[in-house]
């Protein structure tokens, strides 16, 4: 019984912390947070038989919840916007990212690249040289790539797909 109470407290704590963060973001930046990035891609709290997902909480609070180090591209017709795949771009070259872009384009999928800091070195660093090549590729109209903030894409998907 004690474990259940702790788990509920953790879920409540998560909700309270996110609400407080959203309030601060609004106060400091004047914008409303619409997209949530799961810390380290973790979508649950607790252990063993007491494990509980907080995806339903994110679903109520945000238009989109993004994972981390996922392996699959996002199918806009099927995806659960409260837990879409985020594919790591930290430490990757453009040659490693390009096949993912081409696969997404070919199959009508959505590629969500996720990274941490930007620079030329470090374990969780998106390489500036890769970003430069990526931007040049995306800006070329002949490549027919739509790039937009995740929240904008989520709104488009929600508006245009049939449930």
What are these regions (language model features)?
Residues 2-98, 130:
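Catalytic domains of cell-wall/extracellular-matrix polysaccharide-remodeling enzymes
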Residues 26, 59-77, 98-105, 111-163:
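C-terminal domain-boundary segment and adjacent tail
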């Amino acid at each position: 019984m004690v474990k259940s109470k702790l788990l509920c407290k953790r879920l409540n704590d998560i909700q309270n912390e996110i609400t407080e963060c959203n309030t601060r973001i609004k106060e400091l930046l004047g914008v409303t947070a619409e997209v949530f990035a799961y810390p380290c891609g973790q979508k649950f709290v607790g252990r063993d038989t007491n494990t509980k997902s907080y995806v339903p909480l994110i679903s109520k609070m945000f238009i989109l919840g993004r994972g981390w180090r996922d392996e699959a591209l996002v199918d806009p017709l099927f995806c659960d916007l409260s837990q879409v795949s985020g594919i790591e771009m930290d430490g990757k070259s453009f040659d490693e990212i390009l096949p993912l872009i081409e696969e997404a384009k070919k199959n009508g999928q959505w590629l969500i690249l996720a990274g941490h800091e930007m620079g030329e070195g470090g374990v969780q660093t998106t390489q500036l040289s890769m970003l430069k090549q990526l931007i040049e590729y995306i800006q070329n109209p002949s490549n027919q790539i739509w790039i937009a903030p995740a929240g904008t894409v989520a709104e488009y998907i929600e508006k245009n797909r049939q449930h």
